[in-house]
A protein has these predicted regions:
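The catalytic Nudix box helix
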Residues: 52-86, 101
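Hydrophobic/anchoring residues in structured secondary elements
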Residues: 85-88, 123
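Short, flexible, mixed-charge glycine/proline-rich loop motifs
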Residues: 1-6
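Active-site-adjacent beta-strand/loop module that shapes the phosphate/pyrophosphate-binding cleft
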Residues: 89-112
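Nudix hydrolase/Nudix homology domain
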Residues: 48-51, 93, 114-152
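Hydrophobic pocket-lining residues within nucleotide cofactor-binding pockets
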Residues: 58, 80, 105, 126-129
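N-terminal strand-loop-strand
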Residues: 7-53, 79-80, 103-105
């Protein structure tokens, strides 16, 4: 495969077939409850050991909003509402385009972990400054930092 001179793609020098870059669409959701606490998670089987937010891939035929609602339900058992778009971020490490949202989990819903995905899901407050990932470039870290600063 060689770089094509006209397209942002790779071209097979033998048959001319073009292969375009693939982007994996992903959602991340910052879920807050009625007490303005933030739900943070830790992955069950990943090398990433910091706190994260609910996240997952967008499935074929699904909007990013539908994926955010589905991932929240699958991973935590929570029904979310008031979904508000935060921003997007290209993430070259995994060829992803990340769409982020802030949502609400109203009432006294019970967290039910999807244990093959998550090992921890817990509510935190703005006083839990040990969570602050100031030096991390990820949009997840930005969202957690903004929450702790009272800006999310």
């Amino acid at each position: 495969m060689i770089e094509d001179t006209k397209e942002r793609a790779m071209r097979c020098p033998n048959c001319g077939n073009l292969v375009y870059p693939r982007i994996n669409p992903v959602v991340i959701v910052a879920i807050k409850n009625d007490q303005d606490e933030l739900l943070v998670t830790k992955y069950a089987h990943a090398s990433y050991s910091k706190f994260a937010l609910v996240a997952g891939f967008i499935e074929i035929g699904e909007t990013s909003e539908e994926a955010a609602i589905r991932e929240a339900k699958e991973e935590t058992g929570l029904d979310i509402t008031d979904l508000t778009f935060y921003k997007d971020q290209p993430w070259g490490f995994s060829s992803s385009l990340i769409f982020t949202y802030v949502a609400k989990a109203h009432g006294n819903q019970k967290i039910t972990l999807e244990d093959h995905e998550l090992k921890i899901a817990q509510w935190v407050t703005r006083n839990d400054t040990y969570l602050d990932p100031k030096d991390d470039a990820s949009i997840t870290s930005e969202m957690i930092h903004k929450y702790l600063e009272g800006e999310l």
